[in-house]
């Protein structure tokens, strides 16, 4: 059963300008150490940050809160498996929120893409029915 769907699109130039202006302060505010390491080791770090940023927004929408009501940037962590597939780990208030929504086992599916100036993320949260 689907409990939430979220989508977000962001202009990559906005992330590029923010990184240029605030640098490490912005990165450390919005991204975990794992996300920073992964993004910095990508062919195009700015695009990687933008996709992760969009995924955090999309996930917070799927949780029904947006990045408000106690959900913070680092509460949603976008990392990759050994094959490069992105997945989401919830921490702190985001984890508390999903545990309020359901006590059952859940999955979070995320899809990321970028093209020229835009990055997009789609997130679906569903309960495993067994």
Where is each model-derived feature located?
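Core catalytic alpha/beta fold that binds nucleotide/phospho-ligands
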Residues: 1-130
């Amino acid at each position: 059963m689907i409990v939430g769907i979220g989508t977000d699109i962001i202009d990559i130039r906005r992330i590029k300008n923010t990184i240029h202006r605030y640098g490490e302060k912005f990165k450390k505010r919005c991204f975990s150490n794992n996300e920073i390491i992964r993004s910095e080791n990508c062919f195009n770090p700015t695009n990687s940050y933008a996709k992760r940023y969009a995924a955090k927004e999309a996930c917070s929408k799927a949780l029904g809160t947006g990045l408000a009501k106690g959900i913070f940037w680092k509460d949603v962590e976008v990392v990759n498996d050994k094959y490069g597939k992105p997945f989401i780990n919830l921490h702190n208030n985001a984890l508390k929120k999903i545990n309020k929504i359901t006590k059952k086992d859940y999955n979070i599916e995320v899809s990321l893409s970028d093209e020229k100036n835009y990055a997009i993320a789609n997130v679906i949260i569903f309960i495993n029915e067994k």
